[in-house]
From Swiss-Prot:
InterPro entries: UPF0250_YbeD-like, YbeD-like_sf. GO terms for cellular component: cytosol. PANTHER family: UPF0250 PROTEIN YBED (PTHR38036:SF1). It comes from the Bacteria. This is UPF0250 protein BUsg_472. It comes from Buchnera aphidicola subsp. Schizaphis graminum (strain Sg). Belongs to the UPF0250 family. Disulfide bonds: none annotated.
Length: 87
């Protein structure tokens, strides 16, 4: 799968992450903080709450310069304690 994704993308390109995490006030700030380390910029994530309000879905788009940035951010975002899934 990694090879197909790598072949499909032409850099620089926009790439959207969808992150599912616990509905904590600091979740979005933590995600943006991790992204800012790799790719500084202004980010306006789209945030949706689950039906019961236990989880948040955060969609955030970055401009990646290479595939390694996409992979690194995927792993770094996954390490956030409140994050349950990164797509």
């Amino acid at each position: 799968m990694k090879t197909k994704l790598r072949e499909m993308l032409k850099f620089p390109c926009f790439f959207t992450y969808k992150i599912i995490g616990l509905a904590q006030p600091e979740l979005v700030d933590q995600i943006i903080k991790v992204i800012q380390i790799q790719i500084p910029g202004d980010y306006t994530p789209q945030v949706k709450s689950s039906n019961r309000g236990n989880y948040l879905s955060v969609s955030i788009t970055i401009c990646a310069k290479n595939f390694e940035q996409i992979e690194t951010l995927y792993h770094d975002i996954s390490k956030i304690n409140m994050v349950r899934m990164v797509l």
